[in-house]
Amino acid sequence: MAISKDDILEAVGNLTVLELNDLVKAFEEKFGVSAAAMAAPAAGGAAGGAAAEEQTEFTVVLADFGANKVGVIKAVREITGLGLKEAKDLVDAAPKPLKEGVSKADAEAAKKKLEEAGAKAEIK
């Protein structure tokens, strides 16, 4: 019996974020492709103007969970909204990006919460 596109979409729609991440990695390995977004071509005209722009989107990276793993898992759940298992898997896989494309204030708040729980976090 052949699997339809609708069946595949339904199955993918029921996956957790971590399961989707594993699926993407499996696709990358099996087919030798990258899931990275293609960069848009640079617009000509404003020479050097782009270099002076201030970064507006930041990524919070969990570098290390430190000695208080349980507290860090709780903080990760609070920041990301992940379930217990997904948050534990993310903490165990450190260093890992925790939140991507967030404002500077949100990134700093997440970093502060992680550090208060005993983790080492970075903003990139």
Swiss-Prot record:
Domain of life: Bacteria
SUPFAM superfamilies named among the record's database cross-references: ClpS-like, Ribosomal protein L7/12, oligomerisation (N-terminal) domain
Xref: Gene3D superfamilies: 3.30.1390.10, Single helix bin
Annotated CDD domains: Ribosomal_L7_L12 (cd00387)
Pfam entry (one): Ribosomal_L12
Keywords assigned: Ribonucleoprotein, Ribosomal protein
Keyword Lipoprotein appears in the UniProt entry: no
Gene Ontology terms: cellular component: cytosolic large ribosomal subunit
InterPro entries listed in its UniProt record: Ribosomal_bL12, Ribosomal_bL12_C, Ribosomal_bL12_C/ClpS-like, Ribosomal_bL12_oligo, Ribosomal_bL12_oligo_N_sf
Protein's UniProt name: Large ribosomal subunit protein bL12
Organism this protein belongs to: Janthinobacterium sp. (strain Marseille) (Minibacterium massiliensis)
Gene behind this protein: rplL
